[in-house]
């Protein structure tokens, strides 16, 4: 059995810090940089665009193998239940062999009395601006494992295709494939509560996956959007203030979109600008979405765009629980142990409240550990 979740920080890109999950020592926040519009975003992101259009990702986080025999997860939760330790098993399952996509499935052991087949299922999409990281990348493997242990739930982390090798809508197409996979997986245990969740750009993928689920007739209990990554041609106040942002400086943010969007598309494309995206989605279709938990932070550059999405969902009649005033910056849960614990507790609380009777059963089982 693997003792999981070691520290990694191999790039200037601050997404790579993941020690927050189990290390009692606080992961240091990235130092403030004096950046300008003339900064080299390729150097900042530690990437190189090759002549054939592929990308060399020179600062990638370590890729972790799955742990079918289990890894020991020690979680310090912000909830009243206090610390918990669980073994979480993980396996890679094919999604589409032709596309090279897969799902890494995390399942916690020892929850309740043989009820693992009825645990809530969370379909999870990782962050990285559509360009960086995999489901196996250490920070996001760790995030999924801790969520599986903390909620507790089965967490299916989607290894979707990355840009620029596979520009949008490739990741959205992979999300639709993942929804079809969930329908098949959930069919084996009728009544299993299903949730869709994404962090950062993964939140934008999760939103489209939830629409696909509604179109496919898959019942969802909830949708969790953590700091959704959006932009647009005309700068918002938050974006104008983010030129020297410690995590997502404006030039690096612009480059991520340039690499992710279809050729010749600008940031007002529907894949990027929430106003353009929402213009193409009817209120009747939005109304089919399940209850939503939307998380944001006061210093997150896309926060103004996130509020646009929240307003549109509420106007359509969607049950939205918006917590947009969290302290700190983009992806802060990857740096501060207390923020990680708070984030995990928020997700766990939302899942328990919307999972129905089974959510109460799981909560009681966790309290006995």
Question: What is each of the regions a protein language model found here?
Answer:
Residues 32-369:
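Alpha/beta-hydrolase superfamily serine-hydrolase fold, recognizing
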Residues 10-17:
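Cleavable N-terminal signal peptides of Sec/SRP-targeted secreted and luminal proteins
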Residues 20, 26:
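Cationic, low-complexity basic patches in intrinsically disordered or flexible, solvent-exposed regions
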Residues 2-3, 40:
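Context-dependent free N-terminus signature
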């Amino acid at each position: 059995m693997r003792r999981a979740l070691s520290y990694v920080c191999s790039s200037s890109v601050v997404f790579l810090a993941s020690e927050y999950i189990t290390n009692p020592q606080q992961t240091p926040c990235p130092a403030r940089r004096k950046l300008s519009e003339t900064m080299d975003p390729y150097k900042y992101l530690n990437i190189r665009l090759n002549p054939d259009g592929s990308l060399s990702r020179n600062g990638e986080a370590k890729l972790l193998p799955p742990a079918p025999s289990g890894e020991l997860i020690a979680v310090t939760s912000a909830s009243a239940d206090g610390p918990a330790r669980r073994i979480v098993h993980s396996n890679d399952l094919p999604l589409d062999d032709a596309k090279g996509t897969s799902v890494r499935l995390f399942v916690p052991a020892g929850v309740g009395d043989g009820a693992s087949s009825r645990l809530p299922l969370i379909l999870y999409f990782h962050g990285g601006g559509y360009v960086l990281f995999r489901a196996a990348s250490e920070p996001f493997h760790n995030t999924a494992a801790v969520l599986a242990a903390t909620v507790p739930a089965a967490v299916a982390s989607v290894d979707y295709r990355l840009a620029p090798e596979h520009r949008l809508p490739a990741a959205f197409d992979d999300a639709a494939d993942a929804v079809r996979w969930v329908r098949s997986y959930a069919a084996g245990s009728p009544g299993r509560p299903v949730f869709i969740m994404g962090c950062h750009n993964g939140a934008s993928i999760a939103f489209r996956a939830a629409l696909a689920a509604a179109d496919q007739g898959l019942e969802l209990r909830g949708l969790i959007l953590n700091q959704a990554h959006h932009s647009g041609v005309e700068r918002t106040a938050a974006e104008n203030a983010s030129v020297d942002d410690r995590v997502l400086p404006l030039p690096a943010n612009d480059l991520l979109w340039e690499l992710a969007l279809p050729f010749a598309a600008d940031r007002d494309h529907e894949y990027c600008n929430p106003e353009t995206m929402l213009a193409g989605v009817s209120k009747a279709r939005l109304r089919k979405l399940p209850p939503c938990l939307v998380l944001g932070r006061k210093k997150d550059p896309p926060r103004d765009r996130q509020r646009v999405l929240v307003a549109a969902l509420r106007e359509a009649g969607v049950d939205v629980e918006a917590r947009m005033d969290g302290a700190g910056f983009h992806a802060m849960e990857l740096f501060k142990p207390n923020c990680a614990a708070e984030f995990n507790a928020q997700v766990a609380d939302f899942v328990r409240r919307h999972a129905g009777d089974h959510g109460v059963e799981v909560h009681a089982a966790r309290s006995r550990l």
